[in-house]
């Protein structure tokens, strides 16, 4: 199988030193799993994956636990059947749901290997390009978990290794046993904690950062404004950023971003994602969606650059935030 390369699109970026090149916007498939997103259906989900591919996104991210029975991976397997040679597929292992849809962490090597094999079967793949430890298991050393990834590399079931939701100490311990090529942390205009220590370490060790939540669960897409009424079952209501002073601070940021969007002729979401994917150390930003128009919009963040005056204004807006 040919490796996706930079010749397919000039702005593709390399994951670590792997020779695997990806678009600066990736499709994140958590929303189509239907676990927390409302009004998800199979037809729209398949159309959304296809829209991502048609919009120039070659990087699709999923996980063993995206869906109580792996719905996300199964949909991806159907959608990419005729596109595999052009795509980079990432998945994750280490989390599963029980019959009561309660989440469990399991970082034992035998579990990680078994979950990888299940993911390969669901997506009808021979190899997963990038495979992450989804999160640390409090009962298993990350060093022990790392041994499974060495086994998966040696067996040809995965091409590159990543970790998600690990702190820097855990990353270093894992990396000492099995070298990592990418990490997947949250990062956006409202959450920049990784810049203190994590990004410098990644730059020093040639590790890519594939960030999730660039739009902070839709808040920075520009559609959720003051007075927005959330459905009672909307899981976003469990996040402090959607309440009180943090929410108002985000609204003030959006007020400023409106002006930049008008100036550039782009949407707020496109401005936010473009800024995010071009921050130092960021290789690709994961953008989810349950409808085709959503991923088409965020894919429109690729292929252009914010001017210096816009970047300076965004810096001022972020520095003025008051979010705990």
Question: What kind of feature is each model-predicted range?
Answer:
Residues 82-107, 134:
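Structural motif corresponding to the early beta-alpha repeats
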Residues 1-87:
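N-terminal binding-site loop/beta-alpha segment at the start of enzyme catalytic domains
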Residues 27-29, 62, 91, 130-133, ...:
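Conserved beta-strand positions
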Residues 45, 49, 72, 109-112, ...:
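Aromatic/hydrophobic pocket-lining residues that form the small-molecule binding cavity
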Residues 111-132:
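CE4/NodB-like, metal-dependent polysaccharide N-deacetylase domain
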Residues 31-43, 99-113:
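Active-site mouth loops of central-metabolism enzymes
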């Amino acid at each position: 199988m040919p490796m996706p390369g930079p010749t397919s699109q000039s702005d593709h970026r390399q994951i670590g030193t792997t020779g695997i090149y990806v678009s600066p916007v990736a499709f994140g498939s958590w929303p189509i799993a239907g676990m927390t997103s409302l009004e998800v259906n199979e037809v729209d989900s398949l159309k959304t994956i296809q829209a991502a591919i048609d919009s120039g996104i070659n990087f699709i991210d999923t996980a063993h636990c995206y869906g109580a029975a792996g719905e996300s991976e199964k949909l991806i397997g159907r959608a990419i059947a005729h596109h595999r040679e052009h795509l980079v597929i990432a998945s994750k292992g280490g989390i599963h749901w029980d019959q009561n849809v309660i989440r469990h962490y399991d970082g034992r090597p035998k579990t990680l290997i078994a979950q990888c094999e299940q993911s390969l079967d669901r997506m009808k793949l021979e190899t997963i390009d990038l495979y992450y430890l989804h999160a640390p298991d409090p009962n298993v050393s990350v060093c022990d978990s790392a041994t499974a990834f060495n086994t998966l590399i040696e067996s040809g079931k995965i091409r590159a290794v990543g970790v998600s939701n690990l702190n820097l100490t855990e990353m270093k311990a894992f990396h000492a046993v099995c070298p990592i090529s990418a990490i997947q942390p949250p990062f956006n205009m409202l959450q920049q904690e990784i810049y203190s220590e994590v990004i410098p370490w990644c730059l020093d060790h040639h590790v890519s950062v594939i960030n999730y939540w660039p739009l902070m669960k839709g808040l920075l897409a520009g559609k959720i404004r003051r007075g927005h009424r959330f459905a009672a079952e909307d899981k976003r209501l469990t996040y402090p950023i959607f309440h009180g002073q943090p929410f108002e601070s985000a609204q003030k940021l959006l007020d400023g971003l409106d002006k930049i969007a008008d100036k550039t002729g782009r949407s707020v979401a496109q401005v936010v994602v473009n800024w995010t994917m071009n921050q130092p150390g960021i290789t690709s930003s994961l953008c989810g969606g349950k409808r085709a128009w959503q991923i088409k919009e965020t894919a429109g963040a690729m292929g252009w650059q914010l001017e210096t005056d816009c970047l300076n204004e965004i810096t001022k807006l972020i520095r003025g935030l008051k979010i705990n």
